[in-house]
Amino acid sequence: MQNLPSAGPLPAPLAARLVALLAVLAVALGFAAPAQAQLQLRIGGGSFQPMPIAIADFGGDPSLGGLVSGVVTNNLRRSGYFTPLDHARFPEQPNFDAAPNFEKWRATGVQGLVTGRVSRDPSGKLKVEFRLWDVTSGQQMTGQQYGTDTANARRTGHLISDAVYTKITGLGPWFDSRIAFVDESGPKENRRKRLMVMDQDGANVRAITSGETSIVAPRYSPATQDIAFMSQATGHQPRVQVINLETGARQALGNVDSMSASPRFSPDGRRLVMSVQQGGNADIVTMDIATKAQHSGTNGMAIDTSPTYAPDGSQIAFESDRGGSQQVYVMGADGSNPHRITFGAGSASQPAWSPRGDLIAYTRQRNGGFAICVSKPDGTGERVLTEGYHNEGPTFAPNGQYVLFFRDPGGQGGGKLFMVDITGKVEQPIPTPSYASDPTWSPLLAGR
């Protein structure tokens, strides 16, 4: 977002000045509040219940206030970890400048309450404020204010969602991010495939390519505003290309006479790792984007493809049929010590390394079905997140808590996007204008 400075802390209203004083001391002195006064939701391997929470309509400007609070409500509901209270059950419309009537709110069963206000300064800039209240303890848990342009009101809702989500769950933010994907339209035998980008909730969709060439396997850079993808024009070899989302500049990489595919950026965004066809086999190759210097990571008779960097850049996971079937392997970033990490029934392909570094997601095909699975980088602890027909293309959210993928039921239809959390207990559809495949999740936009 342009003209969106870092959020500043927002003090509690005067009606709660004693609580505010304690909160300030807790921050300044590292004082730990009693456990029962903490608004927390711990997400783990066991069962959990979504937290009941109320998100009040933001006061001030009625149209923009409703827009921002609506974004927050939708985000928290879609996360699977919160159940927003229906406004018809609200006991009051909270006054942003006063403490809520906690006794009334406790009677509704909610544990958290979000209040806010949208106003304009003399120059016409927006000021968006919010507070998160712990209804049980009557404490303000956090509060911030943002200054921005009117056009950025919706994105401010994503930033507020992240602040609430991280405060309560202890997990990293992810709402202030985007998704790129391949938009598919037209008859199945002659699909037009365009690169599109949208907010993670499906809003603000825009086409990046025209559809004159077929687009496959886009991937965001972790460090720049670039997306790498495979592009194929009729009668030509598929080529890896990189496009900058800010300038629209586009460049082709790889050898003209060789098919290059499955590009992935290094964590610093300076290199690409890809699969390059060499005769009847395909090898993993890294390329310096600036100098175009190449280094072979694998060199053999197998089909090695779909490489993905560990977030620290020290290792690469990839897919290979060197053992007789498609499986996931891990090697050093310099190509050293390649070793298989997936075993058991069926094949495993399309690995994606979590930005937290703790998990690798992949597609496992077995018994006629396609499962999205995760395991530790050494292959232990495999678990199935979701299973069905043609679940493919896993990619992690910026906080590593959700996996985005596409599901194609077959026939004359096409794929649709879904996300599932790493516990496998939350699965949500992601709206797209048409059929969609090959999603990739951006890093957080804040500070970019």
Question: What are the residue ranges of the model-derived segments?
Answer:
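Bacterial N-terminal signal peptides
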Residues: 19-30
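Amphipathic beta-strand/beta-sheet edge segments enriched in Tyr/Trp
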Residues: 39, 97-163
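Short beta-strand->alpha-helix linker/helix-N-cap micro-motif
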Residues: 43-103, 114-118
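Structural motif
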Residues: 125-127, 188-196, 236-241, 281-285, ...
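Residue-level detector of Asp-centered blade-edge/turn motifs that repeat once per structural unit
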Residues: 173-175, 222-223, 267-268, 311-312, ...
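Hydrophobic beta-strand positions that form the internal "hydrophobic ladder"
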Residues: 179, 227-228, 269-272, 313-317, ...
